[in-house]
Amino acid sequence: MTWETVIGLEIHVQLNTKSKIFSGASTAFGAEPNAHASVVECALPGVLPVMNREVVEKAIKLGLALDAKINRKNVFDRKNYFYPDLPKGYQISQLDLPIVEHGKLEIVVGGDVKTINVTRAHMEEDAGKSVHEGLNGATGIDLNRAGTPLLEVVSEPEMRSAAEAVAYAKALHSLVTWLDICDGNMAEGSFRIDANVSVRPKGQAEFGTRREIKNLNSFRFLDQAINYEAEAQIEILEDGGTVQQATMLFDPEKGETRVMRLKEDAHDYGYFPDPDLLPVIISDAQMQKAKAEMPELPKEMAARFVADYGVSEYDARLLTASRVQAAYFEEAAKESGQGKPTANWMNGELAATLNKEGMELADSPITAPRLAALVGKIADGTLSGKLAKKAFEAMWAEPETSIAEIIEKHSLQQMTDTGAVEAMVDEVLANNAKAVEQFKSGNEKALNAIVGQVMKTSKGKANPAQVQELIKAKLA
């Protein structure tokens, strides 16, 4: 039997406000336990929540970016459950009327574009956390994170592989950081993923029993957890068993999921309207302000890069993965006047070096103007491709040295003496009679071999295009 995996994601996006959703306490990460726990988070008697306007404004921007419906009237509900890190005994969330509904997000997997529908995004507060380390067997409660504003973004169960789920999560991560509503720091919990996974016989309309894998904080773990969970469910069903609805945890060391708790019913919580919070009405002025503050979105910018700079759609998607990357490319491409070569260098040599060194583009010793200067020297014939790679390495090691100084210092100037190049061509032709005969017989690959020999003789300083023209002229 052929099985189909069905995946839906619930992603908790921590909004990068300076204060919490219902109090003025700081949201700064890394403080001493409970340093940022106000009377609201501690649930002291008589305190009331006050809505943070910036949370609403950031939620509106996400709704606009997802081309979603934005509900102008917002009410809050109490999600009731007991846990030590939730002193109130309930979490303030949105149940029936989320601020964002019916959005969509495009993903690309294996070159194919697919649209994933976003069911909703609702505002809610985060809980605190339990601390077990260094307390001699006791458990401490840290409420610094409690009350931190979240947008829980819920997709439709439309992903059919771990690769699609990872692509969706990456696309949403890119979008919320692009909009500057979330810092995207997964290690600090700013972007946490819950994956709902089920399997069914391929072609069956009815969904299988789903299991929810909680708190995945890396794309690699998301991929591993989904693949393991899908295989585990298939094994249960093929052995004649029944998949029980459950909440799962992923063990990254073992690369496997395990049951945290069984769910007897899908509706675990008793919700009711929060009487302490008035409805939040989004005004026309707020909508207009949010629209005016919206940046050019990645999809729009990618289309413009294709039209204005002649880059491929694939390269444009890579270049618009972040605002930092897009701004870097546009600055370098404008300065050099060479869109496609700039994209090739960014997505090739520069990306590989940054990855090797474990660095971010913002910290690169090769700035956009320096890359533009390098690309310009290739365009005007000063550098060949091979010499340009050597120049790039020198530029990386010598961030204060100009491209002109590097070319002179390392003797990287491409040969301009036509007579000297012609003499090298004659020498190579004389020493490679077999390749010459193959080329004359119509073997184009032989030409590349001859050009390669000339480039080797010139130590990479000859112009490959000039060499090729000379060879063709001499063998015509």
Swiss-Prot record:
InterPro entries: Asn/Gln-tRNA_amidoTrfase_suB/E, Asn/Gln-tRNA_Trfase_suB/E_cat, Asn/Gln_amidotransferase, Asn/Gln_tRNA_amidoTrase-B-like, GatB, GatB_C_1, GatB_Yqey_C_2, Gln-tRNA_amidoTrfase_suB_CS
Molecular function terms from GO: asparaginyl-tRNA synthase (glutamine-hydrolyzing) activity; ATP binding; glutaminyl-tRNA synthase (glutamine-hydrolyzing) activity
PROSITE patterns membership: GATB
Database matches in Pfam families: GatB_N (PF02934), GatB_Yqey (PF02637)
Enzyme Commission number: 6.3.5.-
Nucleotide-binding is among the record's keywords: yes
GO biological process terms held by the UniProt record: glutaminyl-tRNAGln biosynthesis via transamidation; translation
Catalytic reaction(s) noted: L-glutamyl-tRNA(Gln) + L-glutamine + ATP + H2O = L-glutaminyl-tRNA(Gln) + L-glutamate + ADP + phosphate + H(+); L-aspartyl-tRNA(Asn) + L-glutamine + ATP + H2O = L-asparaginyl-tRNA(Asn) + L-glutamate + ADP + phosphate + 2 H(+)
Function: Allows the formation of correctly charged Asn-tRNA(Asn) or Gln-tRNA(Gln) through the transamidation of misacylated Asp-tRNA(Asn) or Glu-tRNA(Gln) in organisms which lack either or both of asparaginyl-tRNA or glutaminyl-tRNA synthetases. The reaction takes place in the presence of glutamine and ATP through an activated phospho-Asp-tRNA(Asn) or phospho-Glu-tRNA(Gln).
Annotated family: Belongs to the GatB/GatE family. GatB subfamily.
Description of how the protein assembles with itself and partners: Heterotrimer of A, B and C subunits.
Protein name: Aspartyl/glutamyl-tRNA(Asn/Gln) amidotransferase subunit B
Organism (species): Neisseria gonorrhoeae (strain ATCC 700825 / FA 1090)
Gene name linked to the record: gatB
